[in-house]
Amino acid sequence: MYKLCAVLFALAVPAVRPHGYLSTPVARQYKCFADGNFYWPDNGDGVPDEACRNAYKKVFHRYRAVGAPPGEAAAAAQYMFQQYAEYAAVAGPNYRDLELVKREVLPHTLCGAAANDRHALFGDKSGMDEPFHNWRPDVLYVNRYQRAHSFNVHFCPTAVHEPSYFEVYVTKFTWDRRSPVTWNELEYIGGNGSGLVPNPGDAFCASGQLYSIPVSVPYRPGPFVMYVRWQRIDPVGEGFYNCADLVFGTENDECRYARAAKAVRDQLRQQNLCNDCVEAGPQESCAPTRPQRRAHNYLRRGGAHDQQADGASVRETIDEL
């Protein structure tokens, strides 16, 4: 039944079929596409990102190894990036049977939507499943008291499909990023409450509308993957599957040094030791620079001229940040 549905789908749809992709967080394949420079040279040496280059070369050399000319092997690898909005698979009318989907529709190559044959309907996108150590993550920020991050996932449709529904997963706490993503390593975190809304200004989505899916992502100590399924409700059972790389950052860690530097400037002004200090603008980065680290250490030592009372009060302020 599954193979028959796939054949009927191939006959029924037009040649141009892209439908959508994760834009917040950003899907692996879209990052590779957006970087560009994957058309020359054929072997992928021009791909700027290391992980994307590794994915390209995986597909390219797979077909070169069986005698495909460089141009054909390159076309297979380029297709993986070009079709960033068509990471799709066909489940048939039993698309709600998740065990069927796991067993027969996507038993492997989850990030590539089980596409691992350049001669098949959806091509070969297996490079997206390379367990490379350096896939670029989007950052989710939490403070020291949070064990999860709540936000709206955005799925950017190049063609709207209604009715439909979403399922959102993240890799488990124990997942090793040196291993590919498998169903056994995924934890379901939601998908209910999704809605088609006006694009609120998502920089990675050019569509006027997008799907917004509220989720709460549990904390992970290292890099992890979000896996999203967008499933059409129709007899063909076409679904779209995307991986996005994530890591948690701590707002306190990011901004601590910038705020410490501001506290130093304020203290020096109060003591008339720095009348010409320049106030940082609102866009001051939270990334700790060397002067900001020195400012932090300065406050830890007690402030200007070791004036203990003033220094102590500022230290208490820093500890509260």
Swiss-Prot record:
Q: What is this protein called?
A: Spheroidin-like protein
Q: Which UniProt keywords apply?
A: Disulfide bond, Glycoprotein, Host membrane, Late protein, Membrane, Signal, Viral occlusion body
Keyword Heme, does the record have it? Answer: no
Q: Where in the cell is it found?
A: Host membrane
Glycosylation is annotated at: N192
Functional description taken from the UniProt entry: Component of the virus occlusion bodies, which are large proteinaceous structures (polyhedra), that protect the virus from the outside environment for extended periods until they are ingested by insect larvae.
Q: What is its main location?
A: host cell
**Source organism of this protein record:** Orgyia pseudotsugata multicapsid polyhedrosis virus
Record lineage: Viruses, Viruses incertae sedis, Naldaviricetes, Lefavirales, Baculoviridae
Asked whether the keyword Glycoprotein is assigned, the reply is: yes
For this record, the Gene Ontology CC terms, alphabetical, are: host cell membrane; membrane; viral occlusion body
What subunit structure does UniProt give?
Homodimer; disulfide-linked.
Please list the coiled coil stretches. Answer: none
- Show the InterPro entries listed in the entry: Cellulose/chitin-bd_N, GlcNAc_Chitin_IntDeg, Ig_E-set
Region (Disordered): which ranges?
Answer: 301-321
Q: Give the signal peptide range.
A: 1-18
